[in-house]
Amino acid sequence: MEPEAGTNRTAVAEFILLGLVQTEEMQPVVFVLFLFAYLVTIGGNLSILAAILVEPKLHAPMYFFLGNLSVLDVGCITVTVPAMLGRLLSHKSTISYDACLSQLFFFHLLAGMDCFLLTAMAYDRFLAICWPLTYSTRMSQTVQRMLVAASWACAFTNALTHTVAMSTLNFCGPNEVNHFYCDLPQLFQLSCSSTQLNELLLFAVGFIMAGTPLVLIITSYSHVAAAVLRIRSVEGWKKAFSTCGSHLTVVCLFFGTGIFNYMRLGSEEASDKDKGVGVFNTVINPMLNPLIYSLRNPDVQGALWRIFLGRRSLT
């Protein structure tokens, strides 16, 4: 604890992250599991990115967004897992106040970007299926870049808002965070000043950040579903479901865990459920995304096989 300059309060200089397990016997198991998950996630997402870059058939708007999503997945898991692995190796569970805020900022930057990028991908599928004749014009490279740039701008604003709001809170008592990374709900519980305004801000911004994209995604897929029902060929159905089904699975996983995590701030203590949701948000989702998108997509599968076998595309 260190005294705050110009005040009579004391401020927490560092937090203690309790992590996923407290028993020393389980820590090597957790280390191995998370190291494996991290390497699989990095390898899977970089493979998807490489396939998109080298395969001419994948130089399409849908895969441009998928490549961006792969970069986000790598960033999301890198914000939390390497630091946790380092603490397990060094047997030190502390994180400085500044490092905690930095982790909070980058986590919400990437999570916010995920929200908007998934929305852009839904819009892309809407245009491809409902407006096929004008799709290339409506989803030009300029439009793609504008959508990604706007997503980054909105995500940055969201992350900065929460980080600045968090920096106004005072921490002068307990400093044990019942989690394996710094996040809003757990830090709210440790603050010795009122968090009512911060929680209200989280609900308001969360409604905009999650609610608006979710409404746009549902609207897009309502039109897509109506268009798919008019398709008479079995091949057309298969193609629509192969692209839309993967995206819908990722949307359900991402928004489902996110809403559960941030829309239940009334509980007095952080529980193991919060840690489980945190593992899903930061580890499981980024690890599953490459598998989900490649499992139902023969073009991605073919490109990945050619990369692994060292063959060039015939197109």
Curated annotation (Swiss-Prot):
The residues that cross the membrane are 30-52, 61-82, 104-123, 144-161, 200-223, 241-264, 276-295
Gene encoding this polypeptide?
Answer: OR3A2
GO terms for cellular component: plasma membrane
Q: Glycosylated residues: list them.
A: N8
Q: How does it sit in the membrane?
A: Multi-pass membrane protein
* Cytoplasmic membrane side: 53-60, 124-143, 224-240, 296-315
The region annotated as signal peptide is: none
Q: Per its UniProt record, what Pfam families does this chain match?
A: 7tm_4
Q: What is this protein called?
A: Olfactory receptor 3A2
Q: Which GO terms describe its molecular function?
A: G protein-coupled receptor activity; olfactory receptor activity
Its function? Odorant receptor.
- Keyword Cytoplasm in the entry? The reply is no
Q: Which GO terms describe its biological process?
A: signal transduction
Q: Where in the cell is it found?
A: Cell membrane
Principal subcellular localization: membrane
Topological domain ranges for the Extracellular compartment: 1-29, 83-103, 162-199, 265-275
Annotated family: Belongs to the G-protein coupled receptor 1 family.
Q: Which cysteines are joined by disulfide bonds?
A: C100-C192
Provide the alphabetized UniProt keywords.
Cell membrane, Disulfide bond, G-protein coupled receptor, Glycoprotein, Membrane, Olfaction, Receptor, Sensory transduction, Transducer, Transmembrane, Transmembrane helix
